Amino acid sequence: MKPLGRLRLGVNIDHVATVRNARGTSYPDPLRAGLLAEAAGADGITAHLREDRRHIRDEDITALMQGLRVPLNLEMATTPEMQAIALRHKPHAVCLVPERREERTTEGGIDVAGDIGRLKDFVAPLRAAGCRVSMFIGHDVRQIEASAEIGAAVVELHTGHYCDLVAEGRTAEAARELEALREGAALAHSLGLEVHAGHGISYDTVAEIAAFPQVMELNIGHFLIGEAIFRGLGSAIEGMRRRMDAAREAAA
């Protein structure tokens, strides 16, 4: 199967806000980072408004909605408060993620299969408001099928475990995880879902994931913000964009 089209890059700017909040200052500004990302080739900006506001804050979402030219993808937990915020702002996309206060980052996918009734009701008003709803899930068949059942338009496959295995040099396990992700992407596409992928992606892991023909968007943040310390945000994003495009071209 040939790639379905140009692979989009969503840049997550959460950790610009992490640096800002570490000192309680007004800088660095997440919106400024978003605008730099736009100029460097990002197709969209992702921001996770966590319940504890540990990085992105409510006022950041307002500023991003007003200042960005590319679409905003709002990551959030499935709580009434977050639903109300999304319905007020009506971002282009809403990605629903699991959330625990004690975690350092999103550790796994959302359990759609175990909460179909509630999530179907949660998703419906977001869809009615014009938001493209995405479920951040693992490659488990049940979760993919349940995401289609509740009316999500998109699934974002959690690539964190694969990226960790690559970083740890566990080659055989990484190959098995990559194949499971590939099969998950194919299943999701066959069910009419648009397929995205994200979490933990770096220069070392992007090519294999970008080569999945069904994947239409990668969301990448922490690595790019870290790389920006050494080479600048624009250069870091351009480097990722080049690797994505090369992998896509090779898969065509």
UniProtKB/Swiss-Prot annotation:
<feature type="binding site">
    <location>
        <position position="105"/>
    </location>
    <ligand>
        <name>1-deoxy-D-xylulose 5-phosphate</name>
    </ligand>
</feature>
<dbReference type="InterPro" id="IPR004569">
    <property type="entry name" value="PyrdxlP_synth_PdxJ"/>
</dbReference>
<feature type="binding site">
    <location>
        <position position="12"/>
    </location>
    <ligand>
        <name>3-amino-2-oxopropyl phosphate</name>
    </ligand>
</feature>
<keyword id="KW-0664">Pyridoxine biosynthesis</keyword>
<protein>
    <recommendedName>
        <fullName>Pyridoxine 5'-phosphate synthase</fullName>
        <ecNumber>2.6.99.2</ecNumber>
    </recommendedName>
</protein>
<feature type="active site" description="Proton acceptor">
    <location>
        <position position="48"/>
    </location>
</feature>
<feature type="active site" description="Proton acceptor">
    <location>
        <position position="75"/>
    </location>
</feature>
<feature type="binding site">
    <location>
        <begin position="221"/>
        <end position="222"/>
    </location>
    <ligand>
        <name>3-amino-2-oxopropyl phosphate</name>
    </ligand>
</feature>
<feature type="active site" description="Proton donor">
    <location>
        <position position="199"/>
    </location>
</feature>
<comment type="pathway">
    <text>Cofactor biosynthesis; pyridoxine 5'-phosphate biosynthesis; pyridoxine 5'-phosphate from D-erythrose 4-phosphate: step 5/5.</text>
</comment>
<comment type="subunit">
    <text>Homooctamer; tetramer of dimers.</text>
</comment>
<comment type="function">
    <text>Catalyzes the complicated ring closure reaction between the two acyclic compounds 1-deoxy-D-xylulose-5-phosphate (DXP) and 3-amino-2-oxopropyl phosphate (1-amino-acetone-3-phosphate or AAP) to form pyridoxine 5'-phosphate (PNP) and inorganic phosphate.</text>
</comment>
<feature type="binding site">
    <location>
        <begin position="14"/>
        <end position="15"/>
    </location>
    <ligand>
        <name>1-deoxy-D-xylulose 5-phosphate</name>
    </ligand>
</feature>
<dbReference type="GO" id="GO:0008615">
    <property type="term" value="P:pyridoxine biosynthetic process"/>
</dbReference>
<feature type="binding site">
    <location>
        <position position="23"/>
    </location>
    <ligand>
        <name>3-amino-2-oxopropyl phosphate</name>
    </ligand>
</feature>
<keyword id="KW-0808">Transferase</keyword>
<keyword id="KW-0963">Cytoplasm</keyword>
<feature type="binding site">
    <location>
        <position position="200"/>
    </location>
    <ligand>
        <name>3-amino-2-oxopropyl phosphate</name>
    </ligand>
</feature>
<dbReference type="Pfam" id="PF03740">
    <property type="entry name" value="PdxJ"/>
</dbReference>
<feature type="binding site">
    <location>
        <position position="55"/>
    </location>
    <ligand>
        <name>1-deoxy-D-xylulose 5-phosphate</name>
    </ligand>
</feature>
<dbReference type="InterPro" id="IPR013785">
    <property type="entry name" value="Aldolase_TIM"/>
</dbReference>
<comment type="similarity">
    <text>Belongs to the PNP synthase family.</text>
</comment>
<dbReference type="InterPro" id="IPR036130">
    <property type="entry name" value="Pyridoxine-5'_phos_synth"/>
</dbReference>
<dbReference type="GO" id="GO:0005829">
    <property type="term" value="C:cytosol"/>
</dbReference>
<feature type="site" description="Transition state stabilizer">
    <location>
        <position position="156"/>
    </location>
</feature>
<feature type="binding site">
    <location>
        <position position="50"/>
    </location>
    <ligand>
        <name>1-deoxy-D-xylulose 5-phosphate</name>
    </ligand>
</feature>
<dbReference type="GO" id="GO:0033856">
    <property type="term" value="F:pyridoxine 5'-phosphate synthase activity"/>
</dbReference>
